[in-house]
C-alpha cells in the first residue's frame, strides 16, 4: 500500500522536495520491525500523511489535460513514429544499392537478377559466384599447381587430384571416385532392373544415354519417324495429277506415290537367260515406293529419308553392277586387276569371251563398237557377229554425263541410228565356229593396228601429268576413268539397240538424247 503510493507520487511529480524525501525515508525506516510490530509512537501520524499524499496523487491523475498538452503529446508521438518509417525506407534503399553494386537487381519474388546477362539467382551468394564468370575473378587458388577457381568447392575437389583421395566408394565392388554424382551413376550398373526401355523394339537399358544411342540404330524407331514425317508431308502437299492422266490412266487422282510393282516390259525379260535381270535400278523414294515421271509428279523428299535413301542407292548400285556383269560377263572386270591392253587387238579377245557367255542363236546381233559390231533388221534369227566390216565405221553418239569424261568429238546424225540395221547378215555357220573368232581377231589386228594403238589415240593425264587408264564407250564416245562406272554405263545400253534404254525400253534418236534420258532418269512405264 505504501509502495504503490510512493510510485504514484513519483509519476505525478517528477521532482521531489527534500521534506517529502525525508518523510518517505522516515516511513521506510519506521514502518515496520523485524517482528512485524510498530515500534515508533509516531506511526499513526506518518500513516495519515501518506494517505493524504495518495489522495493528492489521485486528484493529480484525474485532472483533464489541457488542449496544449494534447497537441504537444500528439506532436511528440508523431515525431517518434516518423524516424521509424524513414529508417526502414533507408535500409531498403541501402540494400538495393548494395545489390546493384554487386550487379544484381531484386525481383518481386525475392530473387536476384544479373544486370549483365539477366540470369536469375536465388540468393546473393549465388549471384556473387555468377558475377565472377563475367569479371573473371578466381579467388581460390591451388597451392601446389596454381590452378584457380571461382568456388571453394571446386578447389577442394581439385586438391583431391593431388592427394589421390577418393572418398566415394561403391559398397558392391572396389570402385571409388572423387565425386558423388559419379558414384550415383556407377550404382545404376549394379541395379537388377533396367528402367529405360525402348518402346519400339522392347530392349531395355540401365542408363538413359544408352537408350538414346540405341534409338539412333533402332530400325523400328527410324521407320516410325520416317512414316510420320511422310504422312505430314503428304497431308500438306497434295500434287496435281491432271498431267499424269495421259501417261498413267490407272493411277488415282489423289495418289502421288504407289507401291512399286515390276513393269510388264521388264517382267517379260525374266524368261530369257541372255538378257539382263528384271531387277533393274529404279528411282525409289522410301521403302518399296517408286517415283514416276519427274515433270508429272511433284514430291518433296523429307530429310528423314536420308539414311533410307543411302541404303536404297547402294542397293540399286549393287543391282546395276550385277546386271552389267551379266550383260558383259564376269571376265569384263579383269582389267581392274590387269594392265590396260595396248591395242584394239588385245581388247577383242576379252570382249569376245564376255559376249560368248550371253549370246543366243535366236537373238539379233549386239553391236559393240564401230569396228566390231553389225546388225541386220531383216534376219532376226541369225547369230551375232563380233567383227564389223571396216567399210562401215559407224558409232553411236551421246552427250556427256555427270559420271564420266566427254570426248572432243561432237558429231551426231540420225544416219548413225540407221547404220546398225542396214548391213547384210554374215554367214551363220562361219560365225558359230571357233576358227571364225580367231580369224576375225586377226582381221581386226591387221586393219586397226597400223593406225596406232588405243593409247596413241586416247591419252588421259591427271593433275600431276601422269597418264592414267581410261575406258571408252564406243556408243556414246565417252571416256571413263573408273572401270566399275564404265561397266554400269554399258549396262544402261539396250541389248537389241544401244540407243534403247535397258531400264524402261525408251528408244533415243541419237547419243545426246540417250545420255539426257539416262541422266534425268525419265523412265516411264506404260
Swiss-Prot record:
Disulfide bond positions: none
Glycyl lysine isopeptide (Lys-Gly) (interchain with G-Cter in SUMO2) cross-link site: 95, 442, 448
Pfam families (alphabetical): zf-C2H2
Transmembrane segments: none
Chain residue ranges for the region called Disordered: 28-91, 370-435
Zinc finger residue extent: C2H2-type: 112-134, 140-162, 168-190, 196-219, 471-493, 499-523
In-chain residues carrying the UniProt-annotated modification Phosphoserine: 56, 78-79
GO cellular component: nucleus
Keyword terms, alphabetized: Acetylation, Activator, DNA-binding, Hearing, Isopeptide bond, Metal-binding, Nucleus, Phosphoprotein, Repeat, Transcription, Transcription regulation, Ubl conjugation, Zinc, Zinc-finger
A Gene Ontology biological process term: regulation of transcription by RNA polymerase II
Biased composition annotated in UniProt, kind: Polar residues: 29-50
Subcellular location field: Nucleus
Effect of residue 145 to F: Found in patients with autosomal dominant hearing loss; uncertain significance; affects transcriptional regulation as shown in a luciferase reporter assay
N6-acetyllysine modification, residue list: 288
Entry-linked PANTHER family: ZINC FINGER PROTEIN (PTHR24404), ZINC FINGER PROTEIN HELIOS (PTHR24404:SF33)
Subunit structure: Can form homodimers. Interacts with IKZF4 and IKZF5.
Role, per record: Transcriptional regulator required for outer hair cells (OHC) maturation and, consequently, for hearing.
Record-stated family: Belongs to the Ikaros C2H2-type zinc-finger protein family.
Protein name from the UniProt record: Zinc finger protein Helios
Source organism (scientific name): Homo sapiens
Amino acid at each position: 500500500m505504501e509502495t504503490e503510493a510512493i510510485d504514484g507520487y513519483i509519476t505525478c511529480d517528477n521532482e521531489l522536495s527534500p521534506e517529502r524525501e525525508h518523510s518517505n525515508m522516515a516511513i521506510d525506516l519506521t514502518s515496520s520491525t523485524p517482528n512485524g510490530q510498530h515500534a515508533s509512537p509516531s506511526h499513526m501520524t506518518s500513516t495519515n500523511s501518506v494517505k493524504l499524499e495518495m489522495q493528492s496523487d489521485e486528484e493529480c491523475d484525474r485532472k483533464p489535460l489541457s488542449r496544449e498538452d494534447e497537441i504537444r503529446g500528439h506532436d511528440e508521438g508523431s515525431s517518434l513514429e516518423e524516424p521509424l518509417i524513414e529508417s526502414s525506407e533507408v535500409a531498403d534503399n541501402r540494400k538495393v544499392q548494395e545489390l546493384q553494386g554487386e550487379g544484381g537487381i531484386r525481383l518481386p519474388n525475392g530473387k536476384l537478377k544479373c544486370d549483365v546477362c539477366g540470369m536469375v539467382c536465388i540468393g546473393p551468394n549465388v549471384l556473387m559466384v555468377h558475377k565472377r564468370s563475367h569479371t573473371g575473378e578466381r579467388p581460390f587458388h591451388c597451392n601446389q599447381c596454381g590452378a584457380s577457381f571461382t568456388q571453394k568447392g571446386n578447389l577442394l575437389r581439385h586438391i583431391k587430384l593431388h592427394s589421390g583421395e577418393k572418398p566415394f566408394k561403391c559398397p558392391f565392388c572396389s570402385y571409388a571416385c572423387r565425386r558423388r554424382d559419379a558414384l550415383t551413376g556407377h550404382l545404376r550398373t549394379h541395379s537388377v532392373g533396367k528402367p529405360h526401355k525402348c518402346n519400339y523394339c522392347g530392349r531395355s537399358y540401365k542408363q538413359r544415354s544408352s537408350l538414346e544411342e540405341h534409338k539412333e540404330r533402332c530400325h523400328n524407331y527410324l521407320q516410325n519417324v520416317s512414316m510420320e514425317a511422310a504422312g505430314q508431308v503428304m497431308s500438306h502437299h497434295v500434287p496435281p495429277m491432271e498431267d499424269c492422266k495421259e501417261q498413267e490412266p490407272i493411277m488415282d487422282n489423289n495418289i502421288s506415290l504407289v507401291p512399286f510393282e515390276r513393269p510388264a516390259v521388264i517382267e517379260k525379260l525374266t524368261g530369257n537367260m541372255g538378257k539382263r535381270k528384271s531387277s533393274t535400278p529404279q528411282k525409289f523414294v522410301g521403302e518399296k515406293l517408286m517415283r514416276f515421271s519427274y515433270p508429272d509428279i511433284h514430291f518433296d523428299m523429307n530429310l528423314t529419308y536420308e539414311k533410307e535413301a543411302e541404303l536404297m542407292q547402294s542397293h540399286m548400285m549393287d543391282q546395276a553392277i550385277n546386271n552389267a556383269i551379266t550383260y558383259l560377263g564376269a571376265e569384263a572386270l579383269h582389267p581392274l586387276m590387269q594392265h590396260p591392253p595396248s591395242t584394239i587387238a588385245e581388247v577383242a579377245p576379252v570382249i569376245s569371251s564376255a559376249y560368248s557367255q550371253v549370246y543366243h542363236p535366236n537373238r539379233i546381233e549386239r553391236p559393240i563398237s564401230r569396228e566390231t559390231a553389225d546388225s541386220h533388221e531383216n534376219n532376226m534369227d541369225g547369230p551375232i557377229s563380233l567383227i564389223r566390216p571396216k567399210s562401215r565405221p559407224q558409232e553411236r553418239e551421246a552427250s556427256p554425263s555427270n559420271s564420266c569424261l566427254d570426248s572432243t568429238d561432237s558429231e551426231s546424225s540420225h544416219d548413225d541410228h540407221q547404220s546398225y540395221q542396214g548391213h547384210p547378215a554374215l554367214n551363220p555357220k562361219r560365225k558359230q565356229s571357233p576358227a571364225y573368232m580367231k580369224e576375225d581377231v586377226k582381221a581386226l589386228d591387221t586393219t586397226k593396228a597400223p593406225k596406232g594403238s588405243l593409247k596413241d589415240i586416247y591419252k588421259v593425264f591427271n593433275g600431276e601429268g601422269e597418264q592414267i587408264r581410261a575406258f571408252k564407250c564406243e556408243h556414246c564416245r565417252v571416256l571413263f576413268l573408273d572401270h566399275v562406272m564404265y561397266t554400269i554405263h554399258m549396262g544402261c545400253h539396250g541389248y537389241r539397240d544401244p540407243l534403247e534404254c535397258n531400264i524402261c525400253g525408251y528408244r533415243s534418236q541419237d547419243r545426246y538424247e540417250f545420255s539426257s534420258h539416262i541422266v534425268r532418269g525419265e523412265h516411264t512405264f506404260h
